[in-house]
Each structure stands twice: as structure tokens, then as C-alpha cells.
Design a protein with these regions (language model features):
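Mid-domain beta-loop-alpha active-site segment that forms a flexible
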Residues: 1-7
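NAD(P)-dependent Rossmann-like dehydrogenase/reductase catalytic/cofactor-binding core
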Residues: 2, 13-23, 27, 31-144
């Protein structure tokens, strides 16, 4: 979830937003709810994908209900590409949903990425905030 938050913060910053906004209820709070709630349609979509369902299968199974993450994935993929913002989770999610990439292959690609600073420059404030609140960003170093 923290890597996802880092992607969201990078995109928000590229649009001129304060990246700390992403650490609030509308950002991280919503991300926690959508990732952990058994009532989340987005989580349900992810679980179905992990079990091998296709987007067409999922659409039928949702029975007219909307999982907003599907459309959001398509939109953010195009927007991030246009702005040159690195969003590897969003990119892999797009490939799984719309290009049929196997979930295991997408996960492997994400986990095999070279370790680096998730947030730098003005975005480092988000990283520091997460550390102060006890949320790890995958970087074990103490805040500067």
C-alpha cells in the first residue's frame, strides 16, 4: 500500500498538488479501505484477477456494479504516460486488466524492481510523515 501511495503522491505532485494531501483520509485512508475491506469492489476485482479471471469475466460477475479502479487504472495509465510520471503498480495493473498479462508475471516484475528511493525532493515529506506515524515505506533508514 505504501508503494501505491508513493505513486499517487508522485502523480499528485506532478499536477501541482501538495503530496501531503495524499497522506490524509481521502488519500491513504481510502487506499487502506479499498485494499483491506471485504466489501470493496476494487479488492474483489483484484482477488478475481489473482484467481485467473479475465476483465470480461469480472464484468459479468459484478452484475452491473462498478469497480471504479478499473476505469481509474485506464485513465491514470494514459495521464501518467503523458506527464512522464513513474507509476509501476498502475502500469502493471493496466497490463493485467487490459493486455492480459498474467498476475504472477506482473507481481514478479514489481518485486524484482531495483530498490531505490520511493520519494525524493518535495515528496520526501510524505515519506517522513509515514515514518513518523509508523508506516514503513520500505526504506529502513531513519528520517533525515
Amino acid at each position: 500500500m505504501t508503494r501505491g501511495l508513493a505513486e499517487i503522491a508522485r502523480y499528485a505532485w506532478s499536477c501541482g498538488a501538495d503530496p501531503l494531501t495524499c497522506a490524509g483520509l481521502a488519500g491513504f485512508g481510502d487506499l487502506i479501505a479499498t485494499c483491506t475491506s471485504t466489501h470493496s469492489r476494487n479488492r474483489t476485482v483484484g482477488e478475481m484477477l489473482a484467481k485467473g479471471a479475465t476483465l470480461a469475466d469480472i464484468t459479468v460477475r459484478l452484475g452491473g456494479q462498478v469497480a471504479e479502479g478499473i476505469g481509474t487504472t485506464e485513465a491514470i495509465h494514459a495521464l501518467a504516460a503523458a506527464k512522464g510520471v513513474d507509476m509501476p503498480i498502475a502500469a502493471e495493473t493496466y497490463r493485467v486488466l487490459f493486455e492480459g498479462k498474467p498476475v504472477r508475471e506482473a507481481m514478479r516484475g514489481l518485486m524484482d524492481r531495483e530498490r531505490g528511493e520511493e520519494l525524493s525532493g518535495p515528496l520526501a515529506n510524505v515519506s517522513r510523515l509515514l515514518r513518523v506515524t509508523g508506516v514503513t515505506t520500505g526504506d529502513d533508514r531513519p528520517p533525515e
